[in-house]
Amino acid sequence: HRADLIALLAEGAQDAGVDLRLGQEVTQITREGAAFNLHLADGSTLCPDFVIGADGVRSVLRPALNGAEQGFFTGQVAWRATVPNPGQGAEARVWMGAGRHMVTYPLREGKLLNIVAVQERRAWAKEGWSHPDDPANLRAAFADFTGLARGALKAVDSVHLWGLFRHEVAPVWAKDRAALLGDAAHPTLPFLAQGANLALEDAWVLAHCLRTMEPSDAFRAYAQIRRPRAAKVIAAANGNAWKFHLRNPLMQSLAHTALRFGNAIAPQKILGQFDWVYDHDVTAS
């Protein structure tokens, strides 16, 4: 569960002596020579020696390094919800339909089921994960899904909706005394489930560089190491989107038959096309 991961990271940071200040919002970043000053919503200003912006797709630091950038709406929206596991077991599953697909996978030792449901539509939706929606809208969009999928959707009593936007990988990840990390540097669509993983890889490489170099040199080395892989993964995720939403009945039948046949005789070959993503060991590179 993402909340469990965040709690572990927070605990590790505190054990390492990090001073965590919760409930703070950086509203603006200004430069003073090579330094960056952080202006907070409460009116105070922080003047740190160095800044690492791991502040997500709405990063305040990214435009300070790169200028303003607007993502574009892909014509797809996603719902996310968590429900008690209705009996799916420990498997991750994907259900596909015309212009839609739904992914479910277990959390917390199989007690919970995470649901991510994606639909193609023209109606625009805001970017971000915190926009509540009526569960009835989710169920209506996937009304013809059956079996375990329908059971999971029936159990949803709270759901969030967000628009899927495509962003360019930031041209500049590091400058002077500042660096970007995670979605702040490279927002990704969810079609390879690599957003959080890329951020963790970033963090490991940046920490390794900081252990062996001066911060400004470490920032530059980190960006040089990480940018090519992040760009490659994001391009693969972008290219994976259409495969879930085939509308032509013939193409859909052929593709799904090929998947079933391939999975029956050589499951590892199908999965192997993304070995370079999932088998990557950032600690060894």
Regions found by a protein language model. Give the residues of each.
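Alpha-helical membrane-targeting segments
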Residues: 232-235, 239-277, 285
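Conserved FAD/dinucleotide-binding core of flavoprotein oxidoreductases
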Residues: 1-6, 10, 15-16, 42-44, ...
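Conserved catalytic motifs of the protein kinase core domain
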Residues: 47, 112, 176-177
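Short, flexible helix/strand-to-coil boundary loops that buttress conserved ligand/catalytic motifs
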Residues: 33, 65, 153, 192, ...
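Conserved N-terminal helical subregion
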Residues: 1-82, 122-139, 279-285
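Short, cationic motifs built from Arg/Lys/His that form the positively charged side of catalytic pockets
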Residues: 2, 60-63, 182, 226-230, ...
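Conserved mid-domain beta->alpha element of the FAD-binding
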Residues: 52-53, 104, 137-138, 158-246
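Histidine-centered metal-chelating micro-motifs
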Residues: 58-59, 78-80, 100-103, 185-186
